[in-house]
Amino acid sequence: MTGITDFDALRRAMAENSEEPEGPARNARAEQLLAEAEKLDIPLAVIEALGHQLKVYNYSSEKDKMFVPFARLLRMWDERPEDFDEYEIHSLHWVFKWMSSGMLGQPHIPLASIEKWLAEMEHRYRLAGHSERAVRSAEFSVASHVGDLARADRAYTAWLAADRDTMADCHACELHSQGAWQVERGRDAEALDLWGPVLEGEFTCAHEPHTVLASSLAPLLRLGRADEARAHHLRGFRLVRPMESMRGAYADHVEFCALSGNEARGLELLAERPAYFTDSGNPRSGLEFLSVVTLLMDRLTELGLGDQRVPGPAGRPWTARELAAHARVEALALAARFDERNGTTRVGDRARARMDQRPLVERLPLGVRSAGRPTTAPVTEPTPGPAPEKDLSALLAEARRLSDTLQPHAVEAWLAVARAAEGVELAALDRAEIADHQAMDRGPEGIALFERAAELYAEAGDPGEAWAARARGAYVRALTGEVDEALAAIAEPYDGVLALYAEGATGVRQAAGVLMSRARVLMRGVHEDPSGDSPDGEVLAAAEAAVREVLALVDGHTGDDVRLAARGAEGQAMLAELALRGGDAETAVRLFAKASTAFVGAGLPWFAVEYEARLAGLAHQLGDIAETERALRAALEHGGPYLEAPGRAQLHLQLAEVLGGRGRAQEAAEHALEAAHWSDEAGEGPTLGAWARHQLGGFLLRQGRWAEAAEVLESALPDLSAETHGDGAVVQTKWWLGDCLSELGEHRAAAERRLQAAEIARHWPEQHDHATLAHLAAESLGHAGLHTEADQAYTRAGDLWRSLGNVHGLVRSLRARAWLALRADLADLGLDGARELMSAAIEECEAALLVTDDEETRQRLTGELGHTHRQFGELLARSVAEEAEDTAIQGAFEDALTQTAEAVAVFAALGEGAVHTRTAAELAAGWLEADLSRPADAAARARGVLKAYEGADDGDETVRARRAEAEQLLQLMEEQTDK
């Protein structure tokens, strides 16, 4: 480490250390700087170094170290107050508050010492002339901590009644504490109202809204405001994650995961902060953390995952059950130390209540990448005795009811019958039905069982159902690819059932069953036709004839029989498929809709899902977006609880994309969130889930929800790949993420993402995206203070814009480089370089105008030229410091006025469409005239602006602003003239 040689160097070093991440490394550096300060033999240097050390300790996991530097500072103040400057006097009194709250968090410090310190703080604040607001706030903290609610209420009232002065906590911190008290008293809604200004960004500080976002999570869940809770978690955790000192807020996020069915994410959070299990510098936050660890581990154990490996204290592996026991013991031991010190049970009672909470939401989807909810293995608990099983006759009756009405769980009901019937002598019909449904459950392996079912049906005296069972076996054979064999196999059942039906020896249901199986076999032939998109006409005709035969048979019978109604609906869907194969998409849409309506009308909406989904795809192809949206919504509604996770994810994702395309980003985000959740549930998180998160991030970004979008997009990136999702999706995700990070002020990270995206786009045939990303990366690099890298990126972007013939992009890159050269004072550019770059930008505009005939293009180029002159003028005006010689200032302002006047002339040529840009330039020129001591010319420009807005709508904000500025300039110039 280079030694500190003077006070200024010490101050620079402390400022640099303040920007480092919280933690032991920053604390160690502060200790080194104090040692260096003591070598300077300057009392104020030591005072400032002690203050710096105290601050970094306070904002770290080593809060217990801050009492020593404060005691030394206080002794120095008492002995030689003249060594303190005004700022350090203020700082000394400010950190009295840190001491009182810090003492509360250390159970080894006696309560009497804390009360004595509180009295000392009140005395010193009174001597210094400060309000009692901070003192009453500190008293409230002590009273509420020990559980003296009456005193806490009195102190709370006095705190709010006292005047705010320079010693009061910032608005954000005060509101957090006040809201936390409302939560403590069971008033969640009132707390959230108090926190509103912090959550909305009206009041902020170094640790707010971080803590308010964390504290709001459980209240929001309790109030049923789950969407807000999700948003606060995503936004807040991003703020808390890099702040080592915020273990308490971090614990709130772990608690949220345990209470909202996000146990897997809770484990991920624990894994990120292993030191939080053992950091001992702040016992109070340690208790909070261990309490929620217990809550989470108990929840996992309750879910049957007690033996699952989990993150825990270093040095040994942990299971959820082991960590639950360990964390509970440690937490209660800490709580006992606090209660012993306080003489109450307050801390222990609160810790137990927190550990024993029940989940508030079964499962709240977050949208971020997740391993999925851990697979549960329910804990076996002793029961009073075996539950009485239904008798076989009841099981048979239930299975027949379900299958007769085509309910979703009919096959499972028949399997239950089969298990119960083992070793029981049954009638042939019962055995036939059992075999029939077992065959349905087994797929290709059940073909032989269909034959056995047919034999049993025949034995039971139902030849029609026997033919139907054989027909079902033939269809299953077709599903295996043996279409010709299936057609041959179904010929005999077809002829046989029709003969029986003609004789009145079987019913329409059995006949329809055989005819539908035959139609299904022929439809398999259509699907497997090697001619593909141009299917053989005979194949189509045969299938259509078979379908129409089914429809003719069931016509007139569907009202009384759900099964026959289903045959008719399926027949309409088959005709839709055939129409589509024949190239008639409009007819297919109509027939799919007819099929869906028929299924819903028959009380079988779950069968309509497939056809609404098909209809949605066709409607989208035909450009009917409204019908696409309707069909997707209908599919989700009709599927209800019977939709499997993969299908549900697909439908939500498709609907999200449709809604996003219609500009409804908020609703689109809701469906993309559901798509991400169900993709994870289906085990498709890395594929479909990544795409859903990509879309969700984009929709959140559109709403300006930058932090949430950034969390989601960052979580999507590890799974997105060019091979699976396309490199366009990877680039777009990085692009969006860069935009979010830029809005959040994380400019270095934004530049990194934009450069990564640009590197991929560099290999694309079309280079517009590459140029745009290079330009955006340059902006981020500039904001991050990486000026040389920013200039290089702007140069790269400019070359790309030139190669694309995009004059606007080229000109903007040149202007950006000019500003960068001036502001950053780049060694190889400086003011002369900035002038050259602005001049080059003007030349590019003028050259493009010479070769452009298209009027719209000329208008845009002329506007770009005007903006370039305007910026050139502004750059020149800012190029001289206030302390420069008068001649230098005069020369710079004259040059600036020349460029600004050019801008006015260029904008004037564009007519009324550019009136606002022209008047802005006119006023800028007027102020330059004023600075050059030309009041008459400045006044003339002001009058010109007022004239331009004669009769203009005063409701227009720009009009009002221009008039106000022009009147201000005119008044000042007239006053100067009068003098």
Protein language model features and the residues they cover:
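Amphipathic alpha-helical segments of tetratricopeptide repeats
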Residues: 31-38, 71-82, 116-126, 156-164, ...
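Structural motif corresponding to the intra-repeat A-B loop/turn of tetratricopeptide repeats
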Residues: 20, 40, 60, 108, ...
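Residue at a conserved register position within TPR or TPR-like alpha-solenoid repeats
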Residues: 17, 57, 143, 182, ...
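Residue signature of alpha-solenoid helical repeat architecture, marking inter-repeat boundaries
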Residues: 4, 44, 130, 169, ...
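C-terminal non-catalytic interaction modules
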Residues: 277-426, 898, 902-905, 909-979
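Residue register of alpha-helical TPR repeats
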Residues: 8-11, 48, 88-94, 133-137, ...
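TPR-repeat structural position
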Residues: 23, 43, 63, 149, ...
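Single-residue signature of alpha-solenoid repeat helices
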Residues: 26, 66, 152, 191, ...
